[in-house]
């Protein structure tokens, strides 16, 4: 792309602070053009970052990063921050191996303090840092940028409740309101009241008045009425009561696309010396007509797109698991009036939108509140409904206690459907859905299935909604759904997919890796028996019988090896006094860097070549031991 007069000279936040206000405004336009050009080629979170350009510029002009930590909640709004901290050149390989992460990354820059990309955690991080700096006498301000739905998460409000009781913390909370959570309010009087309320002289005067008035008869009541009247006037003007009632000072609303206005608000907040909320109004997808016009999500996350029209350039990869689930839910909804859908701020991504269109009164979107989603679903089950909770696999982590103690302990007939299970790839460590089976495996009575194709998915979903005495979990991957796989025979909950010798190598696979396992067989010199359980947890009798007859077992899964399918099978055999050599192929117990799903799977030996190699190595080892 052509040289950008301002952006090309930005190497660090000091360069941003040297700009005039007019230059800062011009820089914002250059950054938008840069983002549209780069992200349209690589994919990524485009809409959220287009909405925070001026805000991020203002943050770096007012605060001294990294001395003053800037923490981005969920992290997907950090692209502009990366650009202003010297990483613009890395956008050529955004979310690719060796390139920039799509989220803050401590390995990339000292300006990135927190890299967890799950929502609603920034305020807890910020409070902890601010307390640490205060206790050590350090003159540093911590900034947390939260919004884009993250304030619907309970953890954020737990933090706000704690922060409200921590006066003296140099903590600025920027609420990035992109119009999807609050009603915008503007007005000169409201702005003046905000300035007055954060003026230290005003606070001193208020304290003096309180001491003077409350010494008199009825003084406390009079002061309370005066303070309530003042608060009521401001709340009526700008609707900040939800924050001020907590005891946290509030500034705003501020036009988030006016650099000077945002700077002035941030300067006031910085000078105040106590926790302050700065309410900034922004437009998601700002400056890209196609994004602003997209009512569904304003191009929240895109693949490769046309940088002018916004049209997707991604080649069709066939039907997705999400689409298959969506269709199955619509069919279930027509037959079963007790079926309800539950989601955590992801109605469209998880495939519940078609069901909601048919049955709007039978869908509950709880916001970014997975804990609440699972327990609310348990309550629905207790009342006679059968809820289907659809989440991304990685977000089930946040609701484990509710799964264990609310759904599990109460034998609740709740079905949890986990999209994006296994390796997701480009979004990095925090978004891989590799933890779910290990967690689910310790919930007594829970049943889990990893369907291998559409017919298997539809079948187990129909079975799951008929189970009313325990939670059920269905997990599937981000990849396109494979063609239906032929079943040779079935017995005791186990499907035989390739009929090799029963006393030879038993290759056990589930989910998306069944197709890879069958492809691996074609690369082997000797026959192998391939089986797949209809329900992976608990281990079915058919799998135990097959493993007991086999010479050795190789298990293949796109979840953690620890507490995975192979380890559960080994434990089931051990409980029966049996033992067989078992080689478990899966994801190691470590965090994985961002890359394409296919590249990571190949690196871990979970593609057909890697599976074939593992089988060959096991056979060679056995032949060597017993020759």
Curated annotation (Swiss-Prot):
Protein family membership: Belongs to the transketolase family. DXPS subfamily.
Cofactor annotation: Mg(2+); thiamine diphosphate
Binding site for thiamine diphosphate: 76, 117-119, 149-150, 178, 288, 370
Record's catalysed reaction(s): D-glyceraldehyde 3-phosphate + pyruvate + H(+) = 1-deoxy-D-xylulose 5-phosphate + CO2
Cofactor descriptive note: Binds 1 Mg(2+) ion per subunit.
Keyword match Chaperone: no
Quaternary structure, from the entry: Homodimer.
SMART domains xref list: Transket_pyr
Protein name: 1-deoxy-D-xylulose-5-phosphate synthase
Pfam name, any one: Transketolase_C
PROSITE patterns linked to this entry: TRANSKETOLASE_1, TRANSKETOLASE_2
Species annotation: Cutibacterium acnes (strain DSM 16379 / KPA171202) (Propionibacterium acnes)
Gene Ontology molecular function: 1-deoxy-D-xylulose-5-phosphate synthase activity; magnesium ion binding; thiamine pyrophosphate binding
EC number(s) per entry: 2.2.1.7
Top-rank taxon: Bacteria
UniProt binding sites for Mg(2+): 148, 178
GO-annotated biological processes: 1-deoxy-D-xylulose 5-phosphate biosynthetic process; isopentenyl diphosphate biosynthetic process, methylerythritol 4-phosphate pathway; terpenoid biosynthetic process; thiamine biosynthetic process
Pathway: Metabolic intermediate biosynthesis; 1-deoxy-D-xylulose 5-phosphate biosynthesis; 1-deoxy-D-xylulose 5-phosphate from D-glyceraldehyde 3-phosphate and pyruvate: step 1/1
Electron transport recorded as keyword: no
Cited PANTHER family: 1-D-DEOXYXYLULOSE 5-PHOSPHATE SYNTHASE-RELATED, 1-DEOXY-D-XYLULOSE-5-PHOSPHATE SYNTHASE, CHLOROPLASTIC
Function: Catalyzes the acyloin condensation reaction between C atoms 2 and 3 of pyruvate and glyceraldehyde 3-phosphate to yield 1-deoxy-D-xylulose-5-phosphate (DXP).
Keywords carried by this UniProt record: Isoprene biosynthesis, Magnesium, Metal-binding, Thiamine biosynthesis, Thiamine pyrophosphate, Transferase
InterPro entries registered for this protein in UniProt: Dxylulose-5-P_synthase, THDP-binding, Transketo_C/PFOR_II, Transketolase-like_Pyr-bd, Transketolase_BS, Transketolase_C, Transketolase_CS
Recorded GO CC terms: cytosol
